[in-house]
Amino acid sequence: MHKKGGLAILFLILLRQHKECLQERRKQMKTELKKWTMEDRESLQKICSSADRRYLAERMPDPYTLEDAQWWLEMVREKDGKDGVFCAVVADGEIVGNISVEKKSDVHRKDAELGYVLQTEQWSRGIMTQAVSQICRIAFEELDLLRITALVYEPNLASRRVLEKNGFCLEGIMKNAVVKGEQIYNLCVYGKLRGEQI
């Protein structure tokens, strides 16, 4: 009995140390955005090939090849700064995600859509929360926008939380708006207006 009690105490001490270590690691995590270059093809391919596709649009090729990465990077080179902001997400010096804000057109030209993807092993580290904050600031400064919109499948709670932490408001839910394979999802419409603080 005494031995079991000692093991339980040791377990609790180790668990507490592990939690403190994770919290410290999150504090020290440095997240930056960088412009994509052609030299980043393999990093982009790795991110898109390993992406959890449950809540992504089907337009992203699967498998995602180096040729797909090349095509996308060429498109970004033409559009960046004019029709959107397209960045690699860098955490502790390594490219771990992709994030963009793409302008809409016609009567929606003062609006843009936010999109992002992060390697699954990097989830729950605060990386995308920081990346969204940074790209929204850049997009409002560079693209003459009144708002940024984000569309999220209703069950994607982690992504919704990222947006809410960055001052996005849930503006509505489009019922049965997404059909992916055999699944039907509601689509949450989030918005952030120029000048709104977190």
Model-derived regions: residue spans:
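Intrinsic disorder/low-complexity segments
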Residues: 9, 58, 70, 89-92
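A short helix-loop-beta-strand connector motif used in the catalytic cores of GNAT acetyltransferases and
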Residues: 74-88
